[in-house]
UniProtKB/Swiss-Prot annotation:
GO molecular function: protein-lysine-acetyltransferase activity
Function: N-epsilon-lysine acetyltransferase that catalyzes acetylation of a large number of proteins. Binds acetyl-CoA.
Enzyme class: transferase
UniProt entry keywords in alphabetical sequence: Acyltransferase, Transferase
Organism of this sequence: Escherichia coli (strain K12)
Occurrences of domain N-acetyltransferase (ranges): 3-144
TM annotation in the entry: none
Protein encoded by which gene: yjaB
Name of this protein: Peptidyl-lysine N-acetyltransferase YjaB
Origin superkingdom: Bacteria
């Protein structure tokens, strides 16, 4: 699969929300159903307008996306149908080309993501007992140190 990175388009907002939903459903089974719904509502409210970087396949179909704020990657979500095909790595490499001191946070219970980040060169630099909304889902703070 050939992956390209481009900016998101407003008209593909629903498609990106669908990727978020499939990705979260595949990796975040630790979330309560109520909180999962709350997060989806929040994502639906801001994702179509967010300045995302989108990974697309040869047909220009989105297969993943990330949100980068300065040196911090706020979000990275990959369609589970293409997990293991290098989409996440390509997005991280793109982020590093713009933000060489890249940091991110990941849910501690999301073992797949924790393993991915360590594999591509991140190390744990801290831990929070709660997520960004103050809910009891611990976050690991990560910084890129090189693969």
């Amino acid at each position: 699969m050939v992956i390209s990175i481009r900016r998101s388009r407003h008209e593909e907002g629903e498609e990106l929300v669908a990727i978020w939903c499939r990705s979260v459903d595949a990796t975040h089974d630790f979330l309560s159903a109520e909180y999962r719904t709350e997060l989806e509502d929040l994502v639906r409210s801001f994702l179509p307008e967010a300045p995302l970087w989108v990974a697309v396949n040869e047909r220009d179909q989105p297969v993943g996306f990330m949100l980068l704020s300065g040196q911090h990657m706020d979000a990275l979500f990959i369609d589970p149908d293409v997990r293991g095909c290098g989409v996440g790595r390509v997005l991280v490499e793109h982020a590093l080309s713009m933000a060489p001191e890249l940091t991110t946070n990941v849910n501690e219970q999301n073992e797949q993501a924790v393993g991915f980040y360590k594999k591509v060169g991140f190390k744990v630099t801290g831990r929070s007992e709660v997520d960004d909304l103050g809910k009891p889902y611990p976050l690991l703070n990560l910084a890129y140190v090189g693969a």
